[in-house]
Amino acid sequence: MLKTKLIHPEIMAALSLCGHGSKVLIADGNYPLAEKSGNAQKVYLGLCPGTPTVTQVLEAIHSVCEIEKAEVMKTPDGSEPEIYPEFKKELPDLDLTVLGQYEFYDACMAENVV
């Protein structure tokens, strides 16, 4: 029996395939997952809107593996989304790499997205 914060079997299986430089996409319901996630394994967690939150998923994943880099999508108007401070709190030793919308989509389509 797992005694870690993260116990979801599909996520644990996907993380077991990761190595240095692998990427994991954590997205909310607004992300065009079917079109912009390439061959990555998809794990659907939505129970109802906002549950679980992206930050909750990040915390659970971070509890079982090291995170080397964090890439986030720039907003259309260039403002910083309210969620960025939550990411920075969970990943205090990392700078958030801000990518434009289509650059972010391209990054999510890469072969190293698990």
Regions found by a protein language model. Give the residues of each.
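Electropositive phosphate-/nucleotide-binding environments in soluble metabolic enzymes
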Residues: 5, 9, 48-55, 77, ...
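Long, hydrophobic N-terminal alpha-helical segment
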Residues: 1-47
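A short linear-motif detector with a strong N-terminal bias
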Residues: 2-5, 22-23, 49-51, 92-96, ...
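Long, charged alpha-helical interface segments
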Residues: 75-114
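A phosphate-binding glycine/aspartate-rich beta-alpha loop in the early core of alpha/beta enzymes
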Residues: 36-72
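Structural motif
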Residues: 22-25, 40-43, 68-72, 94-97, ...
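Flexible, glycine/proline-enriched loop segments at strand-loop-helix junctions
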Residues: 1-2, 45, 70-77, 100-102
